[in-house]
Amino acid sequence: MQLILVRHAQPVRIEQVEGAADPGLAGVGVEQAERVPAALGHHRIARVVSSPQRRALETAGPTAAKLGLEVEVLDGLAEYDRDLPAYIPIEDAKVEFRAEYDRIKAGHLPSVIDEPAFRSRVLDAITDIAVRADHTDTVVAFAHGGVVNILLQDILGLARPLTFPIDYCSITRVLFSRTGRRTAATINENGHVWELLPRNISA
């Protein structure tokens, strides 16, 4: 079984709301999301699943439409920030919230996050995806950088939960054998959105 994890496209910024911030996609994010179906075109995808957060669901839309499949929402794929009242894109946090940015770039979750609970939720959701799949299936999951990293940390036995940079709409592929062995086949494939990434738009 192959699990293809796609990070959401670039969302809008939300400063402060009552309750949890749940941003949709920015204009460039819509364009990024529209690149994903072609990037996945050579895979025979049996199922499309997504985090319940808007930025992931809106990213999943073009791919699901192209495949003629429904998007199945899995609560366990939500990001660690799901209950926070603001969403500050990482490229903005680099300037405005340097201490938290440096913490994340050092490979650690934000200090307010319950890391064991987040890890358990994500890994349980991914285990359920694998259990439900036939061994020949390819499932695409639209999720978040933290979700992708938690899985990679578990597979590779890494010390830190946020080891890899995971770009907007990047593709990470994980293979599950029938014996339960998991292999990270590719990490952060981003050629399909390269010129649309913030660091390249502003270059």
Task: Give, region by region, the residue ranges found by the protein language model.
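Short beta-strand scaffold positions
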Residues: 50-51, 120, 142-143
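Generic structural signal for well-ordered alpha-helical scaffold segments
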Residues: 34-41, 119, 123-131, 152
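Active-site-proximal alpha-helix that buttresses catalytic centers in soluble enzyme cores
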Residues: 2-72
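Active-site signature of alpha/beta-hydrolase-fold catalytic machinery across serine-
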Residues: 62, 150-154
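Acidic, low-complexity terminal tails and accessory targeting/binding regions
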Residues: 69-73, 79-92, 131, 135-137, ...
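Generic beta-sheet signal
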Residues: 3, 137-143
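Short active-site segment of divalent metal-dependent hydrolases/proteases
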Residues: 11, 147-148
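Phosphate-handling substructures
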Residues: 67-124
